[in-house]
């Protein structure tokens, strides 16, 4: 028969150390792991995806290689008939407002009121913002 104090201590230690071990696993995954690696353990490195270039050459090559017989939108590389027909880059979170004379701008939807961006643009045009 085991002593109840020893059993209780063992159970409490197990319960207290399990979340700590889980947290260290979380930090290993978040920060790339291997920080506390000991010799003898083998760490398999997967080939990491390469970041896109930090200069404009990739974009320029995409722009120059795009096939478009009308107007090629610089922000989305969409082919449209007129510049003000260009879609917003992030249509799910942006609204487009046409300013007239073939000019259109995109801005955050705001999230509260339908057409909020358009109303703000109109207020700014009137000098109220």
Swiss-Prot record:
One of its GO terms (biological process) is ERAD pathway. Keywords: Signal. The keyword NADP does not apply. Residues 1-22 form the signal peptide. It comes from the Eukaryota. Probable component of the endoplasmic reticulum-associated degradation (ERAD) pathway. Belongs to the LCL2 family. This is Long chronological lifespan protein 2. It comes from Pyrenophora tritici-repentis (strain Pt-1C-BFP).
């Amino acid at each position: 028969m085991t002593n109840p104090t020893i059993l209780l201590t063992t159970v409490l230690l197990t319960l207290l150390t399990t979340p700590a071990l889980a947290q260290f696993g979380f930090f290993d995954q978040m920060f790339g792991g291997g920080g506390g690696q000991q010799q003898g353990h083998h760490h398999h490195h997967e080939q990491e995806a390469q970041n896109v270039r930090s200069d404009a050459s990739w974009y320029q090559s995409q722009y120059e290689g795009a096939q478009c017989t009308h107007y090629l939108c610089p922000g989305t590389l969409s082919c449209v008939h007129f510049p003000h027909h260009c879609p917003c880059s992030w249509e799910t979170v942006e609204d487009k407002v046409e300013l007239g004379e073939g000019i259109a701008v995109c801005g955050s939807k705001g999230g509260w009121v339908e057409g909020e961006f358009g109303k703000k643009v109109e207020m700014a045009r009137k000098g109220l913002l």
